[in-house]
Design a protein with these regions (language model features):
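Small-residue (primarily alanine) positions within well-ordered alpha-helices
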Residues: 15, 19-22, 32, 59, ...
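Short beta-strand scaffold segments in enzyme catalytic cores
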Residues: 30-39
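Short beta->alpha transition motifs characteristic of CBS
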Residues: 42-50
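Glycine/small-residue-rich phosphate/adenosyl-binding loop
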Residues: 43, 60-70
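A short, polar/charged loop-to-alpha-helix boundary motif
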Residues: 51-61
Length: 150
């Protein structure tokens, strides 16, 4: 099933709210949700790297760990990941390892990522088909990230 743009924007506004929780807790301004194919929100997570003193506690990693544990599976191929920014190489690779193949993103990745490997660099090397929709509430997501970083 295809999720309408209006529904994606509605969900992205909730992702932005979740990212605000990360910011208030002193973490990086990122959040991610796991959706079913109809666009229903099943799981929510935000970055907790600083509060957990864990450099791998990005929103997507937290989300994947939570969903796999609760669903008792490592196969998330029936779900969609939505995030306020392009995933870093670690998170995008982890999502692909969890067999997620549908992604919805807001803003592009930050240019200072290390390593600076984009989702499209990784997507181009995947053996399976990966579907990416980007730019949903892009400006709102970008402003949130820039303001949190300043």
């Amino acid at each position: 099933m295809i999720i309408e743009k209006e529904k994606m924007e509605e969900i992205m506004s909730l992702v932005i709210e979740e990212a605000n929780i990360a910011i208030k807790e002193g973490n990086s301004p990122f959040a991610a949700f796991l959706l079913d194919k109809e666009g229903n929100i099943l799981y929510r997570a935000h970055n907790t790297s600083n509060t957990n003193t864990d450099p791998t506690a990005h929103a997507e990693i937290n989300l994947i760990r939570m969903a796999c544990k609760e669903l008792k599976t490592k196969d998330l191929s029936n779900y969609i990941l939505i995030s306020n920014a392009w995933s870093c190489s670690m998170c995008f690779s982890a999502a692909i390892k969890a067999k997620i193949n549908r992604f919805i993103f807001g803003a592009e990745s930050e240019s200072n990522m290390n390593p600076n490997v984009t989702i499209f660099d990784i997507k181009d090397k995947c053996k399976n088909e990966i579907n990416v929709i980007s730019g949903i509430l892009r400006d709102e997501c970008k402003i949130q990230i820039e303001e949190a970083r300043s």
